[in-house]
From Swiss-Prot:
GO terms for biological process: xenobiotic detoxification by transmembrane export across the plasma membrane. The lineage of its organism: Eukaryota, Viridiplantae, Streptophyta, Embryophyta, Tracheophyta. CDD domains: MATE_eukaryotic. Keywords: Membrane, Transmembrane, Transmembrane helix, Transport. GO terms for cellular component: membrane. It holds the Pfam family MatE. PANTHER family: MULTIDRUG RESISTANCE PROTEIN. This is Protein DETOXIFICATION 6. InterPro entries: MATE_euk, MATE_fam.
Length: 483
């Protein structure tokens, strides 16, 4: 069994932390505590993200048309489906994380089951939209050949979306209890499963891009299976996997109360990136622009999952400590997360800049595409810095339960600043894809600044009181779950 997530009485950091000369010792202890969770969570997130990336790479090497179609479908399905499932699960980071900190163990399983049941009808509605994706793209002025490939790919992704409706809540169920090593083992096993399955379906069975999409679905369901087996039979989940049927309706209500703004927060952010990809299809030479911006988005997103892992670990620490009534420890966890982000962003930006002339070949054999990617590499390095900062503070928002503030911050940053700047530079200033990506950088920078201001002005004592009201008082009908 892994180490307890919450700190014991004999450890350096306690709930009565005061600004004394021992602050450096307390920070060091919290940094170690956060790092033990951040590294596995970052690895888990990278492994999960690599599944669709591998599918894009395998399909992209078949032809430029396949790459463009898959890129277009990936953009649309991310913002209309996968971001919704990921965002809704953010409610569990607040509810399950604070319930664990408050030692209200029976609530954790009930929240998780309620989330899974609530996700299924949403998947059905999204799937209907995906069935008509090709016609939608054509009506928006996209290339008919690219739209046909994209529509077929999206339909084959529907099983993957349904799997995410289960996988995301199960991931948060384990994550908020600090059970990150099982998540790590399951994610790596799934990645190793996905690679041969994708190659077999695409090349051996000759299914092309559709095979790449089906491989994602098979791999996601494989991950769901092994996660569910662990939850069912592991002694680590004995106190938390129960379900209180009488409180199902209340759990669903609370799930949507925090899940809807959490999903909005995620979808608004993701939608700017996908909107710019769609806009690139209206530029001169749309196949080149769409392919290059897709590579930039894939690279940026692949890096983003690393600080996202740090943000997930920070969310665990913040939510657990707020639930336990330790607001100053939660505040210290924020500083530790920012410190880890700075180290990670510096290293990754430097590596990308050094490899800027060659990394485009991982996605395409076209020299024209690779040269264009090299030109955009300095902007990607800046994206690494600002996106990572926002990811860490986004974890603070989910752990604290102020997703609604994060959603409004994203509206201002991306739709009032980032998107207008990107469209102006891309179309009116004829900077094409480079101008669109500058808009991304502007939006991400504004998001980070707004979240930083909100975090700096936050009353941690008030957040701890709200956590108790949310978990202990408001839902007193739940069982404690303790022996």
């Amino acid at each position: 069994m892994e180490d307890p997530l919450l700190l014991g009485d004999n450890q350096i950091i306690t709930g009565s932390l005061k600004p004394t000369p021992t602050w450096r010792m307390n920070f060091t202890a919290e940094l170690k505590n956060l790092s033990r969770m951040a590294l596995p969570m970052a690895t888990v997130t990278v492994a999960q993200y690599l599944l669709p990336v591998i599918s894009v790479m395998v399909a992209g090497h078949r032809s430029e048309l396949q790459l463009s179609g898959v890129a277009l479908a990936t953009s649309f399905t991310n913002v209309s489906g996968f971001s919704v499932m990921f965002g809704l699960a953010g409610a569990l980071e607040t509810l399950c994380g604070q319930a664990y900190g408050a030692k209200q163990y029976a609530k954790i399983g009930t929240y998780t089951f309620s989330a899974i049941v609530s996700n299924v009808p949403i998947v059905v509605l999204i799937s209907i939209l995906w069935f008509y994706m090709d016609k939608l793209f054509v009506s928006l002025g996209q290339d008919p050949d690219i739209s046909k490939v994209a529509g077929s790919y999206a339909v084959c992704l529907i099983p993957a979306l349904l799997a995410q409706a289960v996988q995301q809540p199960l991931t948060r169920f384990l994550q908020t209890q600090g059970l990150v090593l099982p998540l790590l083992y399951c994610a790596i096993t799934t990645l190793l499963f996905h690679i041969p399955v994708c190659l077999i379906l695409v090349y051996a069975f000759g299914l092309g891009s559709n095979g790449a999409a089906l491989a994602i679905g098979l791999s996601y369901w494989f991950n769901v299976l092994i996660l569910a087996l662990y939850v069912r039979f592991s002694s680590s989940c004995e106190k938390t996997r129960g379900f209180v049927s009488d409180d199902f309706v209340l759990s669903v209500k609370q799930f949507f109360q925090y899940g809807i703004p959490s999903a909005a927060m995620t979808t608004i952010e993701w939608s700017l990136f996908e909107f710019l990809i769609l806009s690139s299809g209206l530029l001169p030479n749309p196949k080149l622009e769409t392919s290059v911006l897709s590579i930039c988005l894939t690279t940026s997103s692949l890096h983003y999952v690393i600080p996202m892992g740090i943000g997930a670990a920070g969310s665990i620490r913040v939510s657990n400590e707020l639930g336990a009534g330790n607001p100053e420890v939660a505040r210290l966890a924020v500083f530790a997360g920012i410190f880890l982000w700075f180290l990670e962003a510096t290293i990754c930006s430097t590596l990308l800049f050094i490899c800027r002339d060659i990394f485009g070949y991982a996605f395409s054999n076209s020299k024209e595409v690779v040269d264009y990617v090299t030109e955009l590499s300095p902007l990607l390095c800046i994206s690494f810095l600002v996106d990572g900062f926002s990811a860490v503070l986004g974890g603070v928002a989910r752990g604290s339960g102020w997703q609604h503030i994060g959603a409004w911050a994203n509206v201002v940053a991306y739709y009032l600043l980032g998107a207008p700047v990107g469209l102006f530079l891309g179309f009116w200033c004829h900077m094409n894809g480079k101008g669109l990506w500058i808009g991304v950088v502007v939006g991400s920078t504004a998001q980070g600044i707004i979240l930083a201001i909100v975090t700096a002005c936050m009353s941690w004592n008030e957040q701890a009181a709200k956590a108790r009201q949310r978990i202990v008082v408001r839902t007193s009908s739940f069982g404690n779950g303790l022996a």
